């Protein structure tokens, strides 16, 4: 258990190789040095976390429980994630995507295309995509790579849209 932590991906893997060595997704390196404040309980297979984290890519606030982290690609999770001006494009290596601010409830499994299957519901207050900053998005659906099925609504000054259907990202 810990309540305050200042570290990086490389430091964590070096300090706790038997606990975290093969469980942290490598894209977490992109967060750089981070400062985490809150309550976190961590074992080889389980995380219970309620924290706020400042990173090189932006702020993250989260309250979640994650099981089966010993096989992180298929880990299960449930909770809430808040991103504030977070550079999602850099984090996921997608050049058309930029910064995002959101508040989402999540319930699912997996972090890779092979295993990802997640229910998401919440608000995206701002999202930079293709050099435009969209505002006032709402989502409620299931994301199972490469398919999103559910509702999306956008109430942006340049786009008013309500969608209920399926999107194939291939």
Where are these regions (language model features)?
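Interface amphipathic segments
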Residues: 1-170
């Amino acid at each position: 258990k810990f309540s305050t932590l200042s570290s990086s991906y490389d430091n964590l893997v070096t300090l706790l190789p038997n606990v975290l060595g093969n469980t942290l997704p490598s894209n977490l390196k992109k967060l750089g040095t981070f400062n985490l404040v809150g309550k976190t309980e961590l074992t080889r297979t389980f995380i219970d976390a309620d924290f706020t984290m400042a990173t090189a890519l932006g702020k993250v606030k989260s309250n979640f429980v994650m099981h089966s982290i010993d096989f992180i690609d298929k880990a299960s999770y449930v909770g809430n994630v808040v991103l504030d001006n977070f550079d999602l494009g850099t984090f996921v290596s997608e050049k058309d995507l930029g910064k995002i601010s959101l508040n989402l409830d999540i319930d699912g499994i997996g972090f890779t295309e092979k295993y990802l299957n997640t229910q998401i519901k919440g608000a995206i207050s701002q999202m930079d995509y293709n050099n435009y900053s969209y505002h006032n998005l709402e989502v409620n659906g299931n994301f199972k790579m490469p398919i999103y099925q559910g509702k999306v609504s956008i109430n942006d000054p340049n786009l008013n849209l309500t969608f209920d259907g399926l999107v194939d990202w291939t």
